[in-house]
Amino acid sequence: MFHNSVKAHKIADVEVGSFLSSGVDSSYVAAVADVDKTFTVGFGKDEKYNEIGWAKEFSKAIKKKNYSKVIKPEEYWGELKHIQYQMDEPLADPAAIALFFVCQIASKQVKVVLSGEGADEIFGGYNVYSEPNATAYDKLPRFIRRGIGSAAGKFHSRKGVNFLVRKGKDLEERFIGNAYMFTPEERKNLLKIETNAPDPQEITAPYYEKVQDCDDVTKMQYLDLHLWMAGDILLKADKMSMAHSLELRVPFLDKEVMYVAEQIPAKYRVTRKETTDKDTPYVTKYAMRLAAKKDTPKETEKT
């Protein structure tokens, strides 16, 4: 099914390439796609921000040529204004900058690229999706969690307070999307003037209403699929690629792939890891990772 999607997205009269990071999404796409060129960017030498070394090893393993670029500080700041201009509107997502540069190097080699956007939203790839079942604390009665959360909110600087406050609220109250900087309360304290902007819950309520009978993981994915992915992920992907006259295609968002993803039970999207690692006790995109293992080189697997 995914192979068919990649094959369909490769149909073009021009050469097609593939973006490649160390993540399973782009790796899966690049491994399945029979393209000659992959493209990667990074910052500095720290592996946390520079995946070029791994991308070159992976490309070599799948017999493809990798084109890469280390983004220098002066290039970052030098293009920032131009990148914001290309976005047409404010977007507080620094990932747009790396995307701009990887599109830049790809556009010099190909006219169409395949990318891994959408996999996190449909297969359950964000760590926050493990939150609903992450602790035994959730088994406490709701009124007790609310009481503890309300009391904990008075001690802003204490470690663990945010966890207790969040767990004292229902999912519909605490989860307003995959990424945000300030809570509504913090926003009101920071802004010097009153605004007529709706509260986040007013925006998310219609979406939660449509999945009110679903499990919490599915609710979170549904919200991100309709707000985060549409308003950020795909928005910046389209605008950063078009800034370089490059066509970006997303095989994971083929309707057949999305249909299959929808049938996967939540426990196979985010599942408990058989490990003693207390910091990462859950595996995200579990079902998709199992599928990807069949096509990606074993020697390049990352934990």
Describe the residue ranges of each PLM region.
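A short, charged helix-loop
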Residues: 197-209
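ATP-dependent adenylate-handling active sites, centered on carboxylate activation for C-N bond formation
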Residues: 1-199, 239-295
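PAPS-dependent sulfotransferase catalytic core
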Residues: 295-303
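Globin-like tetrapyrrole-binding proteins
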Residues: 229
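Structural motif
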Residues: 92, 211-224, 277-283
